[in-house]
């Protein structure tokens, strides 16, 4: 057992082990989670690697080669969206949109809110942060919820926008929409009412722990929306509707289906921007200025992404690692996609270029532990990372030397950059995340080689670290926060704060939901779904539903951080943590979007995040 000193010694899994323990989570909100590794009796650990004639028989996951070649990535061009002409037109459109927001919409409160929502949905709000905050602060201060003309739609929309921007709005405002006799939300199924129900559904996902009204709103709105979809689908006899099938009647059904698939709050903004722009263009009431502005901004930002990707691709090609190690997942494009999900702002190029390297190394080293390495080799690699000395390479098998050397150099280079910009040496924090990652990966390797089946608690205590969430978020903090604060550093000295734990746990559970079947087929250790099934005797579908329920509860814990006035972390970092949860749900929504190279994976990368295709 290895734990941080000075931290309460409890299992961080009390909130997710079963539904009866969820209420205990609130008592842990101010603590940091110690790093725990559930140890198996050493007498049960054996090395199942078989050696014949001095040749080690290794496992293979038979990963497919990458879809996206080096030459293809380097050929990407967005030259038509660079230069003074585009910049000048963008500035002109920005001024026009600002006038619409501040002048034309000023007298119509609801229209102004809808326009702000449109800016957020099309990933344009970052250009109007000051103006949006001024408008929302004014609306919050005058309590416009008292407006008798506010219906469910207007109330839910304003509630969502205010909560999204950190305002403490009471859930009590929705009580007026409950039935006076039953105290339940009134049933609404007409086309006009369904707009309000959809708005209530989206607002409910901003709920925090113990906010029962918002939980009731979620349950009620889901039931109502599902009934609406069933009735509309039966009436129209159209089992599925695509964006290309757009007309006024189909628009609401399309929006409802999209929302039920995954709420807006849980989606990554880049993919949603493309989806909404495509839909908005077909809207007969669309604003042509906003549409042109959204398209041009989108394509210009995409050109920045492509340069970042090409930079990362050249680094990867220079390492020659993809040529020398054929047993692991060569997934440069997918690794880059994670960085866009964490920080999509155009000015965050440094993060995408440097942290993309970390995602490549995480994937490579994960495959060494999961697939290729023997137990003895993995222990050597773990010890080398803990020593953090290039001389440790002498003790490693040849195939491990280059990954270790790349890791050592990359972390030290990133630490050097932080030292130069902030006069703070963070290498010990970055190193610690990698030591923890490797030790927890080693524990899973020991389980595999011994044939041990962990309990759900044993597995999840280990797996929220082995999934690499702490690596990703510790790096994001130091790469994207300037300046780092003394209070934050003091907290990080103790261990991983709740926001890192909760986001990492969502990453773990979404990963398992998307990948566990494939991993079980190749003989990996049981994942969260299988461990829960073994512990409780439930079916796979029931276990999957439980994991989805836990994800929902973890999101509530994340939402609590928005009102934690004692948090030393910036809103930017809290947003990065939320974005890790969002990009993980995007990647694993339809299976293993990180490892798989099927047509669906290719489509989601090329069309949704639109690193490849312009609008």
From Swiss-Prot:
Enzyme class: lyase
Domain notes: The Asp-Asp-Xaa-Xaa-Asp/Glu (DDXXD/E) motif is important for the catalytic activity, presumably through binding to Mg(2+).
Motif (DDXXD motif): 371-375
Role according to the record: Involved in monoterpene (C10) olefins biosynthesis, constituants of cannabinoids and terpenoids-rich resins. Catalyzes mainly the conversion of (2E)-geranyl diphosphate to alpha-terpinene and gamma-terpinene.
Record-listed Mg(2+) 1 binding positions: 371, 375
Reactions the enzyme catalyzes: (2E)-geranyl diphosphate = alpha-terpinene + diphosphate; (2E)-geranyl diphosphate = gamma-terpinene + diphosphate
Binding positions (Mg(2+) 2): 371, 375
Protein name per the record: Alpha-terpinene synthase TPS33PK, chloroplastic
Similarity comment: family membership: Belongs to the terpene synthase family. Tpsb subfamily.
Cofactor note: Binds 3 Mg(2+) or Mn(2+) ions per subunit.
Species this chain originates from: Cannabis sativa (Hemp)
Pfam families, per database record: Terpene_synth (PF01397), Terpene_synth_C (PF03936)
Pathway(s) per entry: Secondary metabolite biosynthesis; terpenoid biosynthesis
Lineage: Eukaryota, Viridiplantae, Streptophyta, Embryophyta, Tracheophyta
One BP annotation, GO: diterpenoid biosynthetic process
């Amino acid at each position: 057992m290895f734990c941080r000193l000075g931290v309460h010694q409890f299992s961080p899994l009390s909130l997710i082990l079963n539904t009866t323990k969820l209420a205990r989570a609130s008592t842990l909100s101010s603590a940091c989670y110690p790093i725990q590794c559930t140890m198996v009796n050493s007498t049960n650990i054996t090395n199942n690697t078989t050696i014949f004639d001095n040749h080690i028989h290794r496992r293979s996951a038979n990963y497919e080669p990458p879809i996206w070649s080096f030459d293809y990535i380097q050929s990407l061009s967005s030259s038509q969206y660079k230069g003074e002409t585009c910049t000048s037109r963008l500035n002109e459109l920005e001024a026009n949109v600002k006038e619409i927001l501040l002048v034309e919409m000023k007298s119509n409160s609801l229209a102004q809110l809808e326009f702000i929502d449109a800016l957020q949905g099309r990933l344009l709000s970052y250009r109007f942060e000051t103006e949006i905050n001024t408008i929302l602060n004014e609306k919050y201060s005058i309590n416009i919820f008292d407006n008798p003309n506010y219906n469910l739609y207007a109330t839910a929309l304003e509630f969502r926008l205010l909560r999204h921007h950190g305002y403490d709005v009471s859930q009590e405002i929705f009580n007026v929409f409950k039935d006076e006799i039953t105290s339940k939300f009134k049933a609404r199924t007409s086309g006009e009412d369904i707009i309000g129900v959809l708005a209530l559904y989206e607002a409910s996902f901003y709920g925090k722990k113990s906010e029962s009204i918002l939980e009731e709103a979620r349950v009620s709105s889901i039931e109502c929306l599902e009934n609406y979809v069933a009735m509309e689908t039966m009436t129209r006899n159209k089992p599925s509707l695509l964006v290309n099938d757009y007309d006024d009647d189909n628009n609401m059904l399309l929006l409802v289906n999209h929302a039920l698939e995954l709420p807006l709050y849980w989606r990554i903004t880049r993919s949603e921007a493309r989806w909404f722009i495509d839909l908005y263009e077909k809207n007969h009431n669309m604003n042509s200025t906003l549409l042109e502005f959204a398209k041009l901004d989108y394509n210009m930002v995409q050109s920045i992404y492509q340069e970042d990707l090409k930079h990362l691709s050249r680094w990867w090609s220079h390492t020659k690692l993809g040529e020398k190690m054929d047993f692991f997942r060569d997934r440069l494009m997918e690794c880059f996609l994670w960085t866009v999900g964490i920080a999509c702002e155009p000015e965050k190029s440094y993060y995408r270029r440097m942290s993309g390297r970390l995602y490549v190394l995480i994937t490579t080293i994960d495959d060494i532990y999961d697939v290729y390495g023997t137990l003895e080799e993995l222990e050597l690699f773990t010890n080398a990372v803990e020593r953090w000395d290039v001389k440790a390479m002498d003790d490693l098998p040849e195939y491990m030397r280059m990954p270790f050397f790349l890791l050592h150099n990359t972390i030290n280079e990133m630490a050097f950059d932080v030292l130069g910009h902030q006069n703070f040496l963070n290498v010990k924090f970055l190193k610690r995340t990698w030591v923890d990652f490797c030790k927890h990966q080693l524990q899973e390797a020991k389980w595999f080689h011994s044939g041990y089946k962990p309990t759900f608690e044993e597995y999840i205590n280990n797996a929220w670290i082995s999934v690499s969430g702490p690596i990703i978020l510790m790096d994001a903090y130091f790469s994207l926060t300037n300046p780092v604060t003394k209070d934050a550093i003091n907290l990080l000295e103790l261990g991983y704060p709740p926001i890192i734990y909760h986001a990492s746990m969502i990453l773990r559970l979404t990963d398992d939901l998307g990948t566990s079947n494939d991993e079980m087929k190749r003989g990996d250790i049981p994942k969260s779904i299988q461990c829960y099934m073994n512990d409780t005797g439930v079916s796979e579908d029931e276990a999957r539903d439980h994991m989805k329920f836990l994800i929902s509860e973890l999101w509530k814990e994340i939402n609590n951080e928005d009102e934690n006035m004692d948090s030393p972390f910036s809103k930017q970092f809290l947003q990065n943590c939320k974005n890790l949860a969002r990009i993980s749900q995007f990647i694993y929504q339809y299976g293993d979007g990180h490892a798989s190279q099927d047509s669906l994976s290719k489509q989601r990368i090329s069309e949704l995040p639109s690193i490849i295709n312009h609008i």
